[in-house]
């Protein structure tokens, strides 16, 4: 959940913290940790549908996706707006130039990294979409995740990697 804007100009770690400052990790420090889960291709498309349908009426619920591209038509019915969905194949040779896109396989599992709060909210999509969409976070074997604390990403010292810190590290790269 993004809580503040980043304006053009000099940025600080404190500004990055303000953007993603919600929550407390299991380690007792500020900020939700990042977690890694797996979604099927069909579920990735469902997340895109949620974004395309809900964001226009509730901007605070916007999902900011990286490595994905989709096209949608706002004149179509809710939760049926996305008509094209792709994943991006990016080269990390320094310039992060886009190589190509490829279609999403509905049955394949894709690794997704997100904040703990967002990950825990994914399984509410079925109820909130009146059963039209379903997103169930899974482990690498395709089994539903019941304990998100087991999916927390940690640095080499075992510390939780926080959402706000990931943003600060990204901003430092500029």
PLM feature spans:
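Catalytic centers of hydrolytic enzymes
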Residues: 1-174
